[in-house]
């Protein structure tokens, strides 16, 4: 139980910032788009925009960042020490029917958050990012 409290206390200062980032990140329609796919945007412009959002966030926070052709963004605390690799994706599946609100607008209902990508995989990606930010040396 003490470890849980330790990590909750470590994350608490970032909660408001993370929610703002999640809202902005979710708002990016990053469904694979064959029509906007080209050499600079291998998965379409929306996916590239989502990857660039993460890239810019990490650069702003002082991380070493490499964007490999809008396919992979690597975030490092340094380039010398061994690193832990966390893999996540910034694209989302196409929007289906039945959404009671805009699927790219973060909606809070009670203790739950709803939007395309909250659980797969934009929310977890940002959780890992803010964990890295909180724990970095």
Where are these regions (language model features)?
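Acidic/His- and Gly-rich active-site-bordering loop/insert found
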Residues: 2-118, 135-137
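Active-site alpha-helical elements of protease catalytic centers
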Residues: 117-132
């Amino acid at each position: 139980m003490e470890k849980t409290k330790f990590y909750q206390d470590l994350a608490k200062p970032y909660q408001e910032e993370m929610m703002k980032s999640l809202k902005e990140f979710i708002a990016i329609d990053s469904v694979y788009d064959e029509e906007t796919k080209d050499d600079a945007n291998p998965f379409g412009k929306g996916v590239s925009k989502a990857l660039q959002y993460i890239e810019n966030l990490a650069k702003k926070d002082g991380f070493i960042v490499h964007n490999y052709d809008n396919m992979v963004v690597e975030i490092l605390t340094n380039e010398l020490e061994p690193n832990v690799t966390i893999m996540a994706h910034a694209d989302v599946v196409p929007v289906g029917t039945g959404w009671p609100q805009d699927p790219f607008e973060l909606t809070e209902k009670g203790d739950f958050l709803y939007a395309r990508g909250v659980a797969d995989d934009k929310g977890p990606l940002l959780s890992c990012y803010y964990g890295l930010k909180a724990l970095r040396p």
